[in-house]
Regions:
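N-terminal subdomain of lithium-sensitive/metallo-dependent phosphomonoesterases centered on the IMPase/IPPase/PAP
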Residues: 1-89, 264-270
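Small-residue (primarily alanine) positions within well-ordered alpha-helices
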Residues: 12, 16-19, 117, 217, ...
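Residue-level signal for inorganic ion chemistry
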Residues: 23, 48, 59, 92, ...
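Solvent-exposed alpha-helices and their adjacent loops that cap or buttress functional pockets
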Residues: 36, 76-78, 111, 129, ...
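Short glycine/threonine-rich catalytic loop with a Thr-x-Gly-x-Asp
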Residues: 48, 95-98, 185-186
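DPxDG-like acidic metal-binding loop motif
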Residues: 78-137
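Short loop segments at secondary-structure junctions
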Residues: 109-113, 123, 132-135, 141, ...
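An extended, acidic
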Residues: 144-270
Length: 270
């Protein structure tokens, strides 16, 4: 009998790759795109909408009983054991500006546990994926988090958006930088989390992130041997949360610096 999680992993990899090809077509013709604002520093293009519709249609065709949560078109209300979470283009600001740092992200949750995560970066032909209990992979090669011994080695990724105040960000960055840390931000939380799983970055922190940006990457980091803050999947899907994840030694050093974020209430924009 075919394992239902393996079936969904295979489908997620195929759908994400095809969605990334579609997104790349839009990226190469982005001057013709209709672009709208969802809020401060938060844009959506026709590419985001059409790529999500493509992914949703593919999931509905293959798994008609599964639930779906998407960044652009929300959540289906039918209860199901399997729920798919979609970010059609993570890094839209980069996408519309012509910066080749964005990705397509699909994850799948089974009875409250993330079991599949796929991130495709078509600009670099990088295909990241993880299956619960079976490891994390980049282009077929098993990933492992960095062996850095502390924040003085390598760079961490830091997420920042309009839901986070500058003062809140500096609560973390000020002591981090004073301890000799270095940080990187590319405006795609999903891609930075994949970089952590691949050992390119040593950790990632954001005071508030949405489920479609992080669930795939958090599974990859877990399967690549990393440490992370525990989270409630349903709460994450409905409201988002603060996250910290990374190489174990770096994670341990960052935990007290990031503790402020556990009680952080994000800014809500109307």
């Amino acid at each position: 009998m075919t394992d239902p999680i393996d079936t969904r992993l295979s489908a997620a990899k195929k759908i994400a790759a095809e969605a990334a090809d579609l997104a790349m077509e839009y990226f190469n013709n982005r001057d013709a795109l209709l672009i709208e604002s969802k809020g401060p520093q938060d844009m959506v293009s026709q590419a985001d909408k059409n790529v999500e519709l493509f992914v949703r249609a593919a999931i509905e065709q293959n798994f008609p009983g599964d639930a779906i949560v998407g960044e652009e078109y929300g959540r289906t209300e039918t209860p199901a054991d399997f729920t798919w979470i979609i970010d059609p283009i993570d890094g839209t600001a980069n996408f519309v500006a012509g910066i080749p740092t964005w990705c397509v992200v699909i994850s799948c949750v089974y009875k409250g546990e993330v079991v599949v995560g796929v991130t495709v970066d078509p600009n670099h032909n990088d295909h990241y994926w993880a299956r619960k209990g079976q490891g994390a992979y980049l282009n077929g090669k098993r990933m492992a988090v960095s062996n850095a011994k502390g924040i003085g080695e390598g760079s961490i990724g830091v997420g920042y958006c309009s839901r986070i105040t500058p003062e809140t960000l500096m609560t973390f960055l000020d002591p981090f930088l004073k301890r000799g840390g270095m940080y990187y931000r590319n405006a795609s939380g999903a891609l930075m989390l994949a970089y952590v799983a691949a050992g390119r970055l040593t950790a990632y922190h954001e005071a508030h992130i949405n489920s479609w940006d992080c669930l795939a990457g958090l599974l990859m980091i877990e399967e690549a041997g990393g440490a992370f803050w525990p989270y409630n999947t349903d709460t994450m899907m409905r409201h988002g949360s603060a996250i910290l994840a990374g190489a174990p030694a770096v994670f341990a050093e960052l935990e007290p610096l990031a503790a402020y974020a556990k009680d952080y209430q994000p800014i809500k924009h109307s």
